[in-house]
Amino acid sequence: MLNKNCKVEFELNDRELLIFIKGEIDHYSAVLVRGEIDAKIAEVRPKVAILVLSGIDFMDSSGIGLVMGRYARMQNVGGTLVVRDPSERVERILRLAGIERIVKIEKGDKDDEK
């Protein structure tokens, strides 16, 4: 747990890293989440990292930076990044920023939710 407003959990399936982020992504929490995710990516070097955003209640522009930075990090380790299950509001923010041009945004199975 990062703070009372944001929590991150990981699940590794083969070379696929599921990253469950819950709560609010603002400037403060994005810094903490970024560090934790980057450390896990460096540790396991996944082929695919999936940001599961179904638990995000609020996201500002810091969330866009979080996604863009993890995209670059995955490119550096030869992997890909996927955003899964953002709420309508979060998906709208991501699409307004043009994220879907470089990162796949998908709707996943509800079985993947933690």
Model-based region annotation:
Residues 67-71:
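Histidine-anchored nucleotide/phosphate-binding helix
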Residues 1-55, 72-114:
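STAS-like cytosolic regulatory interaction modules
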Residues 59:
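Conserved TIR/SEFIR loop-to-helix hotspot centered on a Trp-containing motif
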